[in-house]
Amino acid sequence: RRQRQMCIRDSPNRRDGDYHAEPAHGWIGSPLEPLGNPLRAGVGPGAWAQRADVPDMTMHGEAKIVPLRVAPDHGVSKRDNDPRGLPVYGADGAVAGQVADLWVDRMEMMFRYIEVALPDGGRRLLPIPFARIKKDGVEVHALLARQFADVPSTRSPEQVTMLEEEKICACYGAGQLYATPDRKEPIL
């Protein structure tokens, strides 16, 4: 029995790269399975929209989402736990990195991302909805510790573009289903 393969490449709406999928079965309407690294394949729960590759701006012309280190007029409430300096744990319980900073949405007055410093020196953004902040660390169910290196990084250390936000959030979304092989199976 020959598996019919479908690769989606170089769509005019995806100027910046390929994304791949193939049918899981040989019949029409079969669910698609990602090819390659499922966290970066751009399909299923890891799909992302081709948004503008520029930062979202405030009505004053400043980058809307920035780290606290460049937004001195924002901070963590004294009544809340400040996670900066705490370890970040992946779904496997291993340390993925350490909280380096928090990224604030200046227009909505809320934190959008946790900046994670990885052991190799890289930095990745962790969307707040994927994080469970506790007194002794930050837990992330979506990814294993080693998979944080697969999260797309930002070009600038002080702002994030709308396209980068899409790809970052898509990576964590993909992790919900593809981080481990057993997550793809039905839950009974």
How does the language model describe each region?
Residues 1-5, 9-188:
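Peripheral interaction segments used for macromolecular assembly
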